[in-house]
Amino acid sequence: MTRSVENRPDWDHYFMEIAEVVSKRATCLRRGVGAVIVKNKQILATGYNGTPKGMPHCAEVGCLREQLNVPSGKCHELCRGIHAEQNAVVQAAVHGVSVDGATLYCTNQPCVVCSKILINAGIRRIVYRDPYPDKLAEEMLAASGMQVERLDFAEQELSLIHI
């Protein structure tokens, strides 16, 4: 069987598909999110949303946000979990890997808390798949000069179906 070069995913779709696989490790009951930090077409770190290392997962003890009736997008601190983007930056730091100038691929648009961390970590470009409307995050990212793009999978998926 011969594959056509035309059917290969471009780099953005390639790394976003990896972020999708990473999201399958998420332990959040509300939403599974995956993140991949890339520089020069090399993966530097990955992260998914879930509780901190060594702590019980929400699937085991329940969702604190649901228990407290916290609406989506509000009071991010009222959660046992850490976001995928935060986890990816932490993993890079733990292993002594600079993410300055890198691109973050994330299955969801970053919230304001993650946006601030990404700006300070030196991430220069964010590519996301699913929107997560957060006006303050969008304003901060724009003011920082961050390049932010939503990746459209529809066109790419059509070409990949015929492999």
Question: Where would I find each of the regions flagged by the language model?
Answer:
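Zinc-dependent deaminase catalytic domain
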Residues: 1-160
